[in-house]
């Protein structure tokens, strides 16, 4: 069976074959290994974003991860990054083996574009029962400018 006839197969093969040489014209537009790894980590980390009157809340599921294993950062003054790594428990007992491994292990990451009215000095993060909640306070709305009155002179 010739798999070349199926365009989806060739697209998938192109995505999986990420070369190391970035000087080549053919490879310049292909995604890098880092991009592919980050995209996979982001897709596997579900999150909700909630807007409150005075703050934004980012709620991220983190089952089985301790709070000290989670890193929350702000990059480029407007990107909230939640990252970390979930490690498999090191239990090596003789004669014990996994029959099925469905829980995702490895690195995780989510990036969120922060709105212009986010107060970067007022960000807090709390992890409780496997759910991380990052709260970003809003900046107060700017005060409306008062109209300037111009004195009309009679000539």
Swiss-Prot record:
InterPro entries, alphabetized: A-crystallin/Hsp20_dom (IPR002068), HSP20-like_chaperone (IPR008978), Small_HSP (IPR031107)
Domain sHSP: 38-155
Gene3D superfamilies assigned to the protein according to its UniProt record, in alphabetical order: 2.60.40.790
Cell location: Cytoplasm
Record-level GO BP terms: cellular response to hypoxia; response to heat
Keyword Cytoplasm found: yes
One of the Pfam families matching this protein, by short name: HSP20
Name of the protein this chain belongs to: 17.6 kDa class II heat shock protein
Taxonomic lineage: Eukaryota, Viridiplantae, Streptophyta, Embryophyta, Tracheophyta
């Amino acid at each position: 069976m010739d798999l070349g006839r199926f365009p989806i197969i060739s697209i998938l093969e192109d995505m999986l074959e990420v070369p190391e040489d970035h000087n080549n014209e053919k490879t310049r537009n292909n995604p890098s290994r880092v991009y592919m790894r980050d995209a996979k980590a982001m897709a596997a980390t579900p999150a909700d974003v909630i807007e409150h009157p005075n703050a934004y809340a980012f709620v991220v599921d983190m089952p089985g991860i301790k709070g000290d294993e989670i890193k929350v950062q702000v990059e480029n003054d407007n990107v909230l990054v939640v990252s970390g790594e979930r490690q498999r428990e090191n239990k090596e007992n003789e004669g014990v083996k996994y029959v099925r491994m469905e829980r995702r292990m490895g690195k995780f990451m989510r990036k969120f574009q922060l709105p212009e009215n986010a107060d970067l000095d007022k960000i807090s993060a709390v992890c409780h029962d496997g759910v991380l909640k990052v709260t970003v306070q809003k900046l107060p709305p700017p005060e409306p400018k008062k109209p300037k009155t111009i004195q009309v002179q009679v000539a």
